[in-house]
Amino acid sequence: MGNWLLPEGLADVLPAEARRIEELRRELLDLYRTYGFELVAPPLVEYIDSLLSGMGGDLNLYTCKLIDQLSGRTLGVRADMTTQVSRIDAHLLNRNSVTRLCYCGTVLHARPADLLSSRELLQIGAEIYGHVGFEADLEILQLVLETVAIAGVSRPRLDLSHPGVVKALFDADPAAAAISGRIIMLLREKDVAGLAELAGVEPALRADTLAALGALVRLYGEIDVIDRARQELPALPALVLALDELERLARAVPDVALGLDLADVGGYGYHSGVTFELYAQGWHDALVRGGRYDDVGRAFGRARPATGFSLDLRKLAAGLSPAEPGRAIRAPWGQDPALVGAVRALRHTGEIVVQVLPGHEHDQDEFVCDRELVLQDGAWTVKTL
């Protein structure tokens, strides 16, 4: 095996792709700032108990672990930045007002999420803390849609769900709550037969709970799913509230293709309100994920209402058209003060000036040099090639 080979699921980012990723990073962080989001930068590595606080067990499987040489405690390389940002809000900033935070940094997965996914992601996201209402959820959704619009993603589709629907069924039926893990697995797999078999193996389950679980796997589609759910599911107060929250948010974003799936329980145990995933042609999986998660900060001693989203910038860039080569000005190498001053002045205006090193006058691959800095009538002048 060659020493230059990288581990499975990891890859170098070459100049054209790196340029596209960096352009997106700058544009998106600038966008988030216009909404009032403050940039934070948590560390790449933390103690494992802090890093996984308030998160589901799935994140533990994705977290690379190592031993701290100074303390002997177990460290984790972050696989997601959301918990870290929640820690900053709850423990370090300790504000009582609404706080908007954004972030961008590398995360590492111990294993890829699927056969086509990378183990190293450049995660960017935004979170609103301190407001439990619809308004914060809508602001996050609007920011998601503006994010993909700026990136050039065409015809996105937004899929909404709400874990409160399933939680209401569990709260109303202790027998269902006792086997919640098994039911969640069956709902994730849309296993209609498996759900039907519960009647024979779990006699304590209420009939209306079994009927509701069977209905959930069929309750997907457009916004009319809400009306069907009101007819087919029991009118439990918490369940009705979840449907109301889902419908209000869905109707607030009429200009995007929308889908609802009431059996989508991917964030169960972590999310506490409306959840969403954004899909688009050219990406095999969800491009953006997010939702409400009000209880994560409790692990840091201060539970705050929270809602937000994140995406992988490298994944986003990979599905976009390649970046155009940069336009540059070619200049000779030299120590003439007038030349040095002319080059510096051009660079200060934002121009790319590539000084050609001796013997490499015809070597230029990365940039398209459409202009040249030449000495004309005793002055350095830019001429079009």
UniProtKB/Swiss-Prot annotation:
One of its GO terms (biological process) is L-histidine biosynthetic process. It holds the Pfam family tRNA-synt_His. Its main location: cytoplasm. Keywords: Amino-acid biosynthesis, Cytoplasm, Histidine biosynthesis. InterPro entries: aa-tRNA-synth_II/BPL/LPL (IPR045864), HisRS-like_core (IPR041715), HisRS/HisZ (IPR004516), HisZ (IPR004517). One of its GO terms (cellular component) is cytoplasm. It is found in: Cytoplasm. Pathway: Amino-acid biosynthesis; L-histidine biosynthesis; L-histidine from 5-phospho-alpha-D-ribose 1-diphosphate: step 1/9. SUPFAM superfamilies: Class II aaRS and biotin synthetases. One of its GO terms (molecular function) is histidine-tRNA ligase activity. Coiled coil: none annotated. Required for the first step of histidine biosynthesis. May allow the feedback regulation of ATP phosphoribosyltransferase activity by histidine. This function is generally fulfilled by the C-terminal part of HisG, which is missing in some bacteria such as this one. NCBIfam families: PRK12292.1-1, PRK12421.1. Heteromultimer composed of HisG and HisZ subunits. Belongs to the class-II aminoacyl-tRNA synthetase family. HisZ subfamily. This is ATP phosphoribosyltransferase regulatory subunit. The gene is hisZ.
